[in-house]
Structure formats: structure tokens, C-alpha cells
Amino acid sequence: MHSLGQVRVKYYKRNVGWTMKSRYRFFCLTLTFVLVLCTAGQVSGSTGTDEKKAVSSIVQMIPAAVDMKETDGPGNLYALSAVLMDGDSGRVLYEKEGYTARPNASTTKVMTCILALEKGSGDDYVMVSENAASQPEVKLNLKEGEQYYLEDLLYSLMLKSHNDTAVAIAEHIGGSVEGFAKMMNAKAKEIGCTNTHFVTPNGLDSADAGGIHQTTARDLALIMSYAVKNKAFLHITQTRDYSFSDITGKRQFSVHNANAFLDMTPDAISGKTGFTGNAGYCYVAACENEERKFIISLLGCGWPNNKTYKWKDAMKLLEYGKANFHKETYWQEPEIPAIPVKDGTDESSGKESGKENKENPGKILTETGTGFADVYINGQIQASDSDKKKQILLKEGEKITCHLRIEKNLTAPVKKGQKIGQVTFSLGELVLDNYFVTADRNIVKITYLWCANKVFHDFFH
């Protein structure tokens, strides 16, 4: 058995994906070649109409470079809902109706894939049911009773968006489509989605007692942000062409990646398209540029015959993000004051009344009327080294604020690790992180029994 993402040796050939840069170079060379052919046709007297139309349709998909610096947004978008998200922090950098729930078609399959990767194994045998085989186009044309490796079906799912494949995977992982939908919705909540309801694993327009199948551009971006952290998911969605067979080897298949955005920019690292009558054209993508990760989410981005709208919108959002956001570490070490503790003593320090312990200077500061010194404790922020290295995409002029809330005084007893405050990092009204401040040691309460024991100990020792 092997985990998904590992390469399994079989008798047939697999063509794994090109690198992002090589795909981009190939696209540019192909475009140049077609342009040369068009020019040659004109020179020789041939109209070259078909070639001109082909080139025109490709060029129109790629918007002209514009200066997006210091703009309020990417300009007009075709999509009804759109989000540009910081793929690392989850912060929404731009949104247009980003929190409005809409049908999301085959972008649903991002969730289907990630659940299969987490719950299944690449060598799992997946049996095709009558229900799976009867799914509508687009489909691989699976037949009832056939068996496939789960890994192979994931390439069919993500490269060509086959609906029958999605149902076969769902029934294998969740026992049924309904059982898998429950898993999908639970995972969505775990990721942080707030207005998502899944009914099917393939995204076909559907509804159940919980409502219609839908999500928001913001939730979809969160799901993609989560998915691209999985190396196997990235490997699958970056693969250009893939070949496989059923378990018996009798039926052979080849699938080609339908995510054309991979060829339009070297920044694209993953993506999934979708279309239904209710959803329109949808798209979700992940892009990386200079260690910045951008997630692009588009819902209702045109209806036939406007398949190219999603590419234009995606490129606009990407260019806007690249021009306006830089990466910055936002940790700030706050100065935490010592906190006085009433009616307590720090036995671990060996302090005597009114005297300062040389090993812990500054802990006993004043005499009280009781003959005992006030005890001061320090706070410790519960943040790891990785927490202190967190980064976020910021626009010019944006500032992260660090706010410390701490108890002004405490009353004994105090236990080590007891919460005594909180540090909050914010960007405007958006709270990025909260970290507890805890007591650095135990403080014992001074009682009559403690006094008696103290007198007895001092007298006999």
C-alpha cells in the first residue's frame, strides 16, 4: 500500500505534469508560431481566417498589462461573486459579493479530492456502482461493477472533472453520496467556512433538506487555501496529462488538464473550473509570486457563450494582488509589566520578608503592614517560534497593531500557567491572532496555617 501522491509502477505509461515555467514557455512559443503562420498566410495571399480567429480568441483571454498599483480594486469583473485571498493567512484582500452564497458547480470537486486524499489510500480498489455509472456528462463512462485505483480516479476527477468518477469516490469514502456529503459539510466547518452547504460530490445543481448545493466565494477560497497545503493535491492538479486503466487493464484512459490558467501565467499552481446552468462558469485557483500565495475565487462568471470571462477576471485579480500587496512578519514583542500579588508568597524563590532574593532581583519590592513583602509575578506569552514567524500580505500604509490586556493585580493563590492576560494582533477591525499570557510560577496564599508552619520552621531551623 502506498499513500496518495507517491508514484505507483504499472505497465502503462504516465505523463506527469510540466513545470509551471515550461508550460508558460510552451504557451508563448505556440502563440508566436501561430502568429507567424497567420502573417505568412497574409503575405502569400491566403486569408488565414481560421488562424486569425484562433489567435484572437487566445489573445483576448489575456488582458493587457495595466498599472494596478494603489487602486481600490481590480476594476470591473464579470463574476457575480469574487474573492482574492491571502493563501497563507486567509485574509480577504478583495471581495465582490464574496459572502453571498451561490451554486459553485465542479469547484466542489476540490473538497471531494481533499477528503479522498485524507481518508483514503492510493491503492484502494474503488467499485463502480449503478448510481456512479449513471451520472450525466461530463463523465469518464465508468461501467457498473468495474474497479479502479482511487489514485487514478482522482486524476480523472481533477483534470477532466468527471461526474461519475466523483460519485464513485464519494461512495467509496463515505459509504454513500449522502454520507460523503455529511463529511464534506463537516470538513467545510472545520476549515472555517460559514455559509457552505454541499449536497453532491460533483457539484451538480441539487438540494436536500438542508438547502441547495452552494458556497460563497470566500468559503471556496478558504477550501482551496487548505487544499494546496497538501502536496498530493498539488501534484494531481499540476499534472498536464495522465493515463490509466481499470484494475483488469482492459480499458485504457487518458485525461488532459482542463485548467488553461496554468498555461496563461507561470504564477498559477493549481485550479479547478466548473459550470452548471444555475452556477454559470466558476473558477478557483491558487497562484504564487515571490513567496506570496494568492487564492482567486469566482462564482457566476458568465454563462454560454462566455467561457473566457473567468480567465480575464482571474488575471485581473492576480495582477491586482501582485501590484499592491507585500509580505510582512507581523509579530511584535509586547512589554509585559510585573503584576503584584496580594496575600501571597513565592516559596520557590526562598524570599524572606522585606528582603530581595539575589537570584530573582526585583520580585519583592515593598514592605506591607503585615510584615510580608508584596510579591510580583511575570507573564509569559503562549506563542511558539512558528507563531512569531507568521506573515501576512499587507497593502502600502496598512499597519498591524498589538494590544496587551493584562490583570493589574492578583490575589493569591496563583498557579503557574494560569491565564492572566491576552495579546491580540489586529489589522483594523480584523483580529489576526490571540495569544494567552500566563503566570510564570506558583504563588502560595498566606494563611494562618502557613504562618504557623513558617514560625515553626524558622524556630527549629
Annotated model-derived regions:
Residues R23-Y24, T100, L150, Y448, ...:
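Structural motif marking the loop-to-transmembrane transition
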Residues G211-H461:
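Domain-terminus/edge residues, biased toward the C-terminal soluble/receptor-binding domains
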Residues Q6, V43-K231:
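Active-site-adjacent loops and short helices of periplasmic peptidoglycan-processing enzymes
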Residues S22-G45:
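Sec-dependent N-terminal signal peptides of Gram-positive bacterial secreted proteins and lipoproteins
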Residues T39, Y155, N259-D263:
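Short, hydrophobic/aliphatic alpha-helical segments
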Residues H2-T19:
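Short, Lys/Arg-enriched N-terminal segments with co-localized hydrophobic residues
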